[in-house]
Amino acid sequence: MAEVADVDLREPEEYPKPVAETERIRAGAQMLNEAANPLIWAGGGIISSRAQEALLRVAEHLQAPIITTPEGKGAISERHPLALGSHRLRNDPVAKEEPHFDTILAVGTRMANPVWLGGQRVVQVDIDEAELGRNYENTFGIHGDARQTLESLYENLVQLSPARESREEEFNALRQRRSETAIRVEPQDSIVATIRNVMPEDGILISGMTQIGYYSRAFFPVYEPRTFLTSSYAGNLGYAYPVALGAKVAQPDKAVVAVSGDGGFLFNSQELATAVQYGINAVVIVFNDNAYGNVLRDQVNRFEGRVYGAALHNPDFVKLAEAYGARGVRAGIDQLEGALAEALAVDAPTLIEVPVQAMPTPFE
């Protein structure tokens, strides 16, 4: 056990990105050029590939609005005329209203929830060939890196036809219909709006597996890439706070806020020690309903109120934070705005506990 040995460290490898086949690019561009009413579905692959500019060039040439997955939030600023926000599973005019989108360009998304597609043709771009057409049959797949493929698609599109006339007025009306028909629930809607109003536009929100996190996927506007982080399909409890610390280390000059439930936060609450030890001044908002909220709601509503393993006996979160040397604050929903503004102004790791009651389902 006390021996010393030399170890050869391996050099990091730059794994080559797949380059889309020329013929697939040409065929995909032709399909998009022929589409009367195209729509772009942008996923996290846009963010990973840093393909925002290439995406926007294609969208503006086609006058195709962009809807994002939660992982793709930030692929386009939600103030852009072509931005429709994130898709909703139900009651979404993008799916229900005419004229229907006839061709979908899906980039960097598994299309795991294609429930609102109604027979449209899909041109799917993905770096993982196994994902092409896996969740939706009527798919023309292009295997390649998002940025490189979008750049090639754009080069082909400009050769096929000039840029289309602006449809800004039409899409503004669609955005308005989406806003008017959205199923908004309280207190989630007010809380998410408060957090957005307090955070700077380039601030980073980590969306934990909690009622506020779920709701933020559709209703937290994002204006820059890599400013909305989520555990995606994995749905990990305990994800939010450690990721917030990593984000703050990577971007020390940006505001970093994690939203977490009480149950999820307790998976990694000991990382308060890390934050204090290394001066990582991220903010975590713990929404405390003394339960695994989703599980408890389902047990009450679907299993005749038989509650098992969903109610929690929690610590005093303010004292817990203070025991580690962090700032601890307790704030009601109506006090959250001031508490968050103060936390972002203070040069110290901060936990804000917000006591809440059981919330209605955000999955609408």
Predicted features and spans:
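Glycine-rich phosphate/diphosphate-binding loops that line cofactor/substrate pockets in enzymes
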Residues: 25-38, 58, 98-100, 194-201, ...
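Glycine-rich, anion-gripping cofactor-binding loops and their flanking helix/strand elements
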Residues: 44-123, 223-253, 268-270, 301, ...
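Short alpha-helices
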Residues: 127-159
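Conformationally flexible catalytic loops at phosphate/diphosphate-handling active centers
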Residues: 1-34, 183
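Glycine-rich ThDP/TPP pyrophosphate-binding loop and its adjacent helix/strand module
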Residues: 20-27, 33-34, 322-361
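Active-site diphosphate/adenylate-binding microenvironment
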Residues: 171-247, 253
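Conserved thiamine diphosphate
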Residues: 1, 71-73, 98, 100, 106-124, 300-339, ...
